[in-house]
Design a protein with these regions (language model features):
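Sensory beta-strand/linker motifs that couple input domains to effectors
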Residues: 194-196
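Membrane-proximal amphipathic alpha-helices
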Residues: 33-49, 55-70, 79-84, 173
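Glycine-rich acetyl-CoA-binding "A-motif" of GNAT/NAT acetyltransferases
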Residues: 190
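Extreme N-terminal signal-anchor transmembrane helix of membrane signaling/transducer proteins, especially
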Residues: 3-38, 42, 46-47
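A short beta-strand signature within small-molecule sensing/ligand-binding domains used
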Residues: 173-182, 274-282
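Intrinsic low-complexity, intrinsically disordered coil/linker regions enriched in small/polar
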Residues: 115, 187, 201-286
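Extracellular/periplasmic ligand-sensing ectodomains of membrane signal-transduction proteins
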Residues: 96-174, 227-250
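Single conserved hydrophobic/aromatic residue that forms the stacking wall/gate
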Residues: 287-296
Length: 296
């Protein structure tokens, strides 16, 4: 199956760099308090930003590995497009070969395979405890996937998309995110959305344990500002950095949130309950290659 590219590479790349600066969910903020002005030296600031940069780079690299897995699997999938009953081997391989990916599926446009009916979504999930892969075919009136965000948003945007984090339906309070890649035929028409879902546990655990100084604490927030980690666990996925700032009338925190969601890196000095405090923040940048679409 041949694909065509509709935009110049430079244009597509600039779109993706901008989009993922805002879309990637992982943003890190470390608040430092109980250090007076003399103790917060340029070395401390440089060291802290170095730690944040290293973690942001590590997270971006791991997210990129998910995209790479899907991109590489796409070519295998396209070579087997006429063998729908063999596609389970591809998605099972996806969840087995990338340690971040726990679920994967290929959601076809309605009635793509006439013999399969309106819905056809081969889907595989990995049980990390048993390392057993479960395969099933999804799609029904009760699971109308063409109307779901992970399918609809990349379809409308015509580019790959990382979902806002969500709790896994299977329970266990596992925060996940789904990467969706739209696939196009040689006429430039969408025929499927290839997805990979990952657990964010290792990212949130890493951030929660990050304490550059004894009196420091960290946040991990999504691109919409939702807390993915927080000292108060009741606020995780239930509040945003902005709702907390509003409730506490903390204008500095609101400013920090806006800076973070704008994709900026920086330092802000502010008063934190009469303590001279410093916020250090950065954003993960995810540079990704464009979806294989064709040039006309």
């Amino acid at each position: 199956m041949k694909h065509t590219f509709s935009h110049s590479f430079a244009t597509r790349l600039s779109i993706y760099v901008f989009s993922f600066t805002l879309i990637v969910f992982a943003t890190i903020m470390a608040l430092f308090y109980n250090y007076n002005h003399e103790k917060v030296t340029s070395y401390a600031i440089e060291r802290t930003h170095g730690l944040l940069s290293n973690i942001a780079t590590e997270i971006s690299s791991q997210l990129m590995s998910v995209e790479t897995t899907i991109n590489q699997s796409t070519w295998v999938f396209e070579r087997n497009i006429n063998l729908p009953d063999s596609l389970h081997l591809i998605i099972e391989s996806v969840v087995k070969n990338n340690p971040l990916i726990v679920k994967s599926g290929i959601a076809f446009t309605p009635n793509y395979y006439k013999e399969k009916g309106k819905y056809f979504m081969p889907y595989a999930s990995l049980d990390n405890k048993t390392n057993h892969v479960t395969y099933q075919v999804l799609g029904s009136q009760n699971y109308d996937y063409p109307c779901m965000d992970w399918y609809l948003i990349p379809k409308m945007q015509k580019q790959a998309y990382w979902s806002e984090p969500y709790y896994d339906d299977g329970g266990g309070n596992i925060i996940m995110s789904t990467y969706s890649k739209p696939l196009y035929d040689n006429r430039g028409e969408l025929f499927a959305v290839f997805i990979a879902s990952i657990s964010l546990t290792q990212f949130t655990d890493t951030i929660s344990l990050l304490k550059p100084y004894p009196s420091s604490y960290t946040y991990l927030i999504s691109r919409n500002g939702s807390f993915l980690t927080h000292a108060d666990r009741d606020k995780i996925m239930n509040e945003t950095i902005f709702s907390e700032a509003f409730a506490t009338e903390n204008h500095s925190q609101e400013q920090i949130g806006r800076e973070m969601l704008a994709g900026h890196t920086g330092t802000i000095r502010f008063d934190n309950q009469e303590n001279d405090s410093y916020a250090f923040y950065t954003t993960c940048l995810l540079y990704t290659s464009p979806s294989p679409r064709d040039s006309t």
